[in-house]
Amino acid sequence: MGGLRPFAPEFYFYIVGTCCAEISHALRQVTGGKAMTNEDATQLKIRPEDDPWYLLATLYGQPREGDRELQARNRKAWNRYVAQWLNEDAKGAVTKTRSLGAEDTVLLNEEEMTSLREAFAKRHHQAGSSADPEIGQAKPSFIDFSDVEFDRLFWAEGFVFPVVTWFARTRFSEGAMFQGAIFCEKSVFSHAVFSGWADFQRATFHEAEFRFTKFKGGVAMFDNAVCSRWADFEGANFSSANFPSVNFTAALFKDVEFGSAEFPRASFGNVSFPGAIFNFTSNFRGATFGEADFKAAIFKRDPNFVNTDLKGPTSFESVMFSSKPPRFFDAKLHQGTVWRNAIWPLPMLSAEAGDFTDAYERLKLEMDGLKKHEDELYFFKLEMQSRRVMYGNLTDISELRVLGRTISLKRIALKWPASGLPIAIYGFLCDYGRSYVRPLVGLLVTAGVGALPFWLSFGWPSKFWQALGFSLANTFGVIGFRKDFIKPEVTEHLLGILKVFAAIQTVTGIVLLFLFGLAIRNRFRMK
């Protein structure tokens, strides 16, 4: 700082200048090495021809869709040029791929390098590029396509990217072809926008970053893609996502919004979908998970987990299944599978209730096998509620038979209890065997309210306690209270209707006592 005096005006100018320089350096790092300008602030994009890496990728011209011969020439030129920066392990990985051969890693000799430089200079001149016309051989820190706006097909099928590669904030107006591409180091597609289809089939990633990337125009295809370290899709948006048979060591899909999501036969070491939204189909059929986290995810349609293998702890905590329960037929669930605070749907129509019943029955059996008793009871409740809708509470009577005669009831609307009504009563009385409070309250109400007619019969108002005792004895008659505490002549002098009432009270008590005992057994896991 030399002779600058603290608190002098020039001191503050020095500090501000130093801070600005540091901030500028940081922004260049974030933006892939380019200085941040006012154009960046307004999101003005770079013309493809002004990016030197694009010129190299299209060394012999921009191929049209279907022009595989020109694309192959460009690919071989790119791969042989960057092969000088590949180590032996990377070269071995490249030669093992199905789409590339050993010729893609053959180093350019001096004559071929000179020819490539001449071709680059010619391409630079024809494109009217503002990029550096010279192409060097020193290994770069990164390959940078950041902020480029591609208004045409970007065709990088089978390209090898030997160093950190940036496509941050890049826009692809047409299709983007990365099929079979190999990213040897970190690849960054954060905040990129794919307005057309995006093809990453059979691509190989080391570290992949697609944070807040938008795939909004077509299908994003990652079929058979491999990621050896981690893939980060936080905040990404997919109109349609295909990840069949991918092999990701670790992946994060935090707050991702999917249109349709296809993950059949996918293999994940650790994967997280916290806060993800699945707007349409979500297919994980045959997928394998190490540890999985779906906390607070929302499934709006039909989640398919058939034949999935959850090898590690899996969290469905606070998940919302909006329209249909997940299907876990032939799935293998880990004992650490958690459903805490999950929101489950119930069928509205009997036509769909069968699918709900089957799904909840499967989950109930899975929880029974894992000895997760509370979850088993809860899925049994959901199964019963679905069965009630399937069977219905009341059914229409179209005709009535009386003394051998059939009476049509087309003009008279009559109902008859259906098979679902007992299930509804079972749920009301004890929450399908989960609540011992409900039958206990029912017993007290039966005894208390049932005492009123006996009170009137025995003598109002002095015989209240006698009437209450008689009502309690009836309610708990199965235990033998009435025989032990009530004289036989008391019952003999009752009116006939009160005798019928006492019998109904005893039957009600038997049912409620049974439900109370069942709930106690279930709640405290008594065998």
Placement of each model-derived feature along the sequence:
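Cysteine-centered motifs
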Residues: 19-20
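N-terminal leader/targeting and pre-domain segments
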Residues: 23, 36-420
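Pore-loop/selectivity-filter region of tetrameric P-loop cation channels
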Residues: 419-436, 454-506, 515
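Alpha-helical transmembrane segments of polytopic integral membrane proteins
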Residues: 450, 513-517
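Segments forming glycine/polar-rich beta-alpha architectures that bind adenosine-containing cofactors
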Residues: 434-453
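Aromatic (phenylalanine/tyrosine) cluster motif
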Residues: 7, 11-14
